[in-house]
Amino acid sequence: MRLLAPIPVDRRPRRFVQLLAGLLLYGATMGMMVRAVLGLDPWDVFHQGVTAWINHWIPLSYGAVITIVSVVVLLLWIPLRQRPGIGTIANAAIIGFTTDATLAVLPTFTNLPTRIALMTMAIVGNAVAGALYIGAGLGPGPRDGLMTGLVARGVGSIRVVRTTIELTVLAVGWILGGVVGVGTVLYALAIGPLLHLLLPRLMVKSAVPQTVRVNRVPEAVGAGPSGTAGEIRGAAVVAAGQGDPNPHPRPEFHDPVAVDPDQIWEDGEGR
C-alpha cells in the first residue's frame, strides 16, 4: 500500500513551483495577520493559544507550534484511511517555518490604520496563497484532509464537520490566550468568496486525459454531501482542455470521499 497519494504525471514543474510559491506566501500572510493584532482565523487562534500556553513550560515559537499541530493532525488521518499527497507533507513542513521568518522581520504596528491595511493585505494574500497551493493539485492541507476524512466516514456533511472543527479549535484557542477580534470575522466572511473567485483561475489543468477511479457517489441527484452509495468498480475518463464541459477541473481527492469540492472552496481555506 502506498503511503503517499500519486503525483499527477503532467505539468509537474509548474505544479511544484506553484505549490512552493503558495506555501511560502501562506506562511508570510499568517505572520502578517499576527502582527496586525486584529484577530486570526480559527486554526491560528488555536495555534496562538497553544503557543502561549506551552511557553509556560517549553519555549516554542509560533511557527514550531503550527508544524507540531500539522503533524498531530496528519496522525489523525491514519484511522480515517486518508493518504497525504506531497503537497500535504510540504504544507506541514514549510508554512510554520515561513511564518516564523515573517514574524522575525516584520515589526509590531501600533497605528490602527496600518494594522487594518496589513490585515486586509494578509487576507487577500492568504486567499491567493491558498488558491496557488490547492490549485497545484498535489494534496490537501492536513486540516482539510481531516475534515474530508471525517465526512467520508459518514460523520456528517462538510458544513457540519467543518463548522464543528473550527468552532472547537476557535474556542480552545481563545481560552488558551489566542486573539479573537474583528479580523476573525473579516477572514471568515472574505476567504470563501475570494477562494471561489481565484481557485478556478489558478487550478493547474491537465494536459492529457486522466483516468479517475470513482469509489463512492451520491445516492441520487441532489443528495447531500454525506449521502453515499455502494462502491462502483471501473474508471471514468475525464478530458481536460478544449471541449471539456467543465473547463475548471476540481481539486483531486485521491481517497474515496463523497463530498462536493465546491463546498470546500466556499467554506474557507484549504489548509
Each model region followed by its residue ranges:
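Core subunits and conserved enzymes of cellular information-processing
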Residues: 1-243, 247-270
